[in-house]
From Swiss-Prot:
Keyword Glycoprotein in annotation: no
Functional summary from the UniProt entry: Troponin I is the inhibitory subunit of troponin, the thin filament regulatory complex which confers calcium-sensitivity to striated muscle actomyosin ATPase activity.
PTM-bearing positions, type Phosphotyrosine: 27
Annotated region described as Involved in binding TNC and actin, given as residue ranges: 130-151
Gene3D superfamilies xref list: 1.20.5.350, 6.10.250.180
InterPro entries, sorted: Troponin, Troponin-I_N, Troponin_I, Troponin_sf
Protein name, entry field: Troponin I, cardiac muscle
Superkingdom assignment: Eukaryota
Any GO molecular function: calcium channel inhibitor activity
Length: 211
């Protein structure tokens, strides 16, 4: 018994099998096995009813805001454009009243001009900031491009500039041979037998045999 216990103690015991977590096993089973889709708790008619109700509420809010704007505009007009009292006024008083009205009109025009300048400045700043954001994100607005037919020469001219003409002119470095020189060379090549006969003295003897 002692020997068996010593042998058992000396042998290495096998490593235990890895234990899988239930979460991964459940996820694998959920992904592989078919399962029915969950039904929505709200029916289609109920969804349509809720959408209609939301649209009605939004319409009421818009109408209320428009009514508030109209009321604010009327209040401002009543404050700034008070009714004129012209009864019992003389000529000079009417002239003074006209001058006052013209001064008020000029003041309102100045205020309107200042407000328009501020609005334009704000719009420009917003556009600049938006462009900076696009630049930082790396999202550039691509312009609309149209197809243009271009020849190979024009393409090389656009790419290489002044060097395009030099690169395309491939015959510039070749030796130019005139037509007269070619005819002269052909004539000389064709008469080589006559030249040999004249040099060897055989020209006169050929004439005797031919005669």
């Amino acid at each position: 018994m002692a020997d068996e216990s010593s042998d058992a103690a000396g042998e290495p015991q096998p490593a235990p099998a890895p234990v899988r977590r239930r979460s991964s096993a459940n996820y694998r089973a959920y992904a592989t096995e078919p399962h029915a889709k969950k039904k929505s708790k709200i029916s289609a008619s109920r969804k349509l009813q809720l959408k209609t109700l939301m649209l009605q509420i939004a319409k009421q809010e818009m109408e209320r805001e428009a009514e508030e704007r109209r009321g604010e505009k009327g209040r401002v007009l009543r404050t700034r454009c008070q009714p004129l009292e012209l009864d019992g006024l003389g000529f000079e008083e009417l002239q003074d009243l006209c001058r006052q009205l013209h001064a008020r009109v000029d003041k309102v025009d100045e205020e309107r001009y200042d407000v328009e300048a501020k609005v334009t400045k704000n719009i420009t700043e917003i556009a600049d900031l938006t462009q900076k954001i696009y630049d930082l994100r790396g999202k550039f607005k691509r312009p609309t491009l149209r197809r243009v037919r271009i020849s190979a020469d024009a393409m090389m001219q656009a790419l290489l500039g002044t060097r395009a003409k030099e690169s395309l002119d491939l015959r510039a470095h070749l030796k130019q041979v005139k037509k007269e020189d070619i005819e002269k060379e052909n004539r000389e090549v064709g008469d080589w037998r006559k030249n040999i006969d004249a040099l060897s003295g055989m020209e006169g003897r050929k004439k005797k045999f031919e005669g």
